[in-house]
């Protein structure tokens, strides 16, 4: 009984909580300009439009250099877990992004994002995503 609180801390979080945590880590990596943290969340077969994982990494470096000061917020995050496998999921959210070289943003946009995730070795990785502007 005395070990119960310690053992509880070692449990794997439920899939939905783990997915929300993975999305939050992605958000934090994007805002912080941490290419490594973002790349750690991308599956080996990741796709975004015509970009594969490697090309997405190069694009991130360019964006981070162009906008050294940036903010990223994921809002209205909804997780839809595959009820059969519990290893695949769709996560949708609104993304608000803005950035620039100084304190005031030079550019800002908002997107509706639909992303597919897969559990690999205990970690949730992003397989692909679709984003469209909220003004579209």
Predicted regions and their residues:
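N-terminal export leaders
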Residues: 1-2
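Exposed beta-sheet edge and beta->alpha loop/turn motif
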Residues: 82-136
């Amino acid at each position: 009984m005395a070990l119960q609180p310690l053992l509880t801390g070692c449990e794997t979080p439920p899939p939905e909580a783990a997915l929300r945590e993975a999305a939050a880590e992605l958000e934090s990596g994007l805002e912080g300009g941490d290419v490594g943290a973002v790349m750690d969340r991308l599956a080996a077969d990741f796709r975004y439009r015509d970009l594969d994982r490697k090309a997405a990494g190069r694009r991130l470096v360019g964006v981070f250099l162009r906008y050294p000061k940036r903010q990223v917020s994921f809002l209205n995050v909804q997780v839809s877990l595959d009820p059969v496998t519990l290893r695949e999921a769709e996560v949708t959210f609104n993304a608000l992004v803005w950035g620039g070289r100084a304190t005031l943003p030079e550019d800002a946009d908002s997107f509706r994002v639909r992303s597919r995730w897969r559990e690999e070795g205990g970690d949730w990785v992003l397989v692909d995503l679709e984003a469209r502007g909220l003004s579209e």
